[in-house]
From Swiss-Prot:
One GO molecular-function entry: metal ion binding
InterPro entries: G_ENGB_dom, GTP-bd, GTP-bd_ribosome_bio_YsxC, P-loop_NTPase, Small_GTP-bd
Stated family: Belongs to the TRAFAC class TrmE-Era-EngA-EngB-Septin-like GTPase superfamily. EngB GTPase family.
EngB-type G domain: residues covered: 22-194
SUPFAM superfamilies: P-loop containing nucleoside triphosphate hydrolases
Residues the record lists as binding Mg(2+): 37, 59
Official protein name in the record: Probable GTP-binding protein EngB
GO BP of this protein: division septum assembly
Species annotation: Leuconostoc citreum (strain KM20)
Top-level lineage group: Bacteria
Cellular component GO terms held in the UniProt record: cytosol
Entry keyword set: Cell cycle, Cell division, GTP-binding, Magnesium, Metal-binding, Nucleotide-binding, Septation
PANTHER family: ENGB-TYPE G DOMAIN-CONTAINING PROTEIN, MSS1/TRME-RELATED GTP-BINDING PROTEIN
Binding sites annotated in the UniProt record for GTP: 30-37, 57-61, 75-78, 142-145, 175-177
């Protein structure tokens, strides 16, 4: 998709605040600092549109980005960050669960994992949960520029094994915000799910 017009239209914490115009939505989930904002910036070809931070746990709301007046990217708070309170983690969990299980406009979820590491318990739980609710999933292995392309198969097989990956219901791609590797493939998946 050729992207010229993007606008962050709102930050929401409950269904009453979600957009009401019926556009399709693609949510981005993953642990804190896995690269959700960097993926968004790369997809829309803007350097600092979605705020990136070296400080984990920065995103605390569902952030809706209107892309070309055709769809929304929904940046979901990162999970697995230990320095937020248990009460705050529960609130994030409830907010995310409400959104993902009840939002009719949600067409799919891009679940980000770090290509260099085994998926965390939270990554596995999120994948299983999305799969349980029959939500189309694209697993994106970020930071792939940090590993040799000759080792992609090894890393892909390991990530899929750890997640219990179901290829009949999910897709998998490597991605790098540094080199833009995988950008077009992610867009193809998004377009197919609009």
């Amino acid at each position: 998709m050729n992207v010229n017009n993007v606008e962050m239209v709102m930050s929401a914490v409950s269904a009453a605040q979600y957009p009401t115009d019926g556009k399709p939505e693609i949510a981005l989930v993953g642990r804190s600092n896995v690269g959700k904002s960097s993926l968004t910036n790369t997809l829309i070809q803007r350097k600092n549109f979605a705020r990136t931070s070296s400080q984990p746990g920065k995103t605390q709301t569902l952030n809706f980005y209107d892309v070309e007046n055709q769809l929304y990217f929904v940046d979901v708070p990162g999970y697995g960050y230990a320095k937020v309170s248990k009460k705050q983690r529960e609130a994030f969990g409830n907010m995310i669960e409400e959104y993902i299980t009840s939002r009719k406009q949600l067409r799919g979820v891009i679940s980000l994992v770090d290509a260099r590491h085994d998926p965390s318990e939270d990554d596995v739980a999120m994948y299983e949960w999305l799969h349980y609710y029959n939500i189309p999933i694209l697993v994106v292995a970020t930071k792939s520029d940090k590993i040799s392309k000759s080792k992609f198969n090894k890393y892909e097989n390991n990530i899929k094994k750890q997640l219990g990956f179901d290829s009949s219901a999910s897709d998998f791609l490597f991605f790098s915000s540094e080199t833009k590797y995988g950008r077009d493939s992610v867009w193809e998946w998004i377009t197919a799910h609009m």
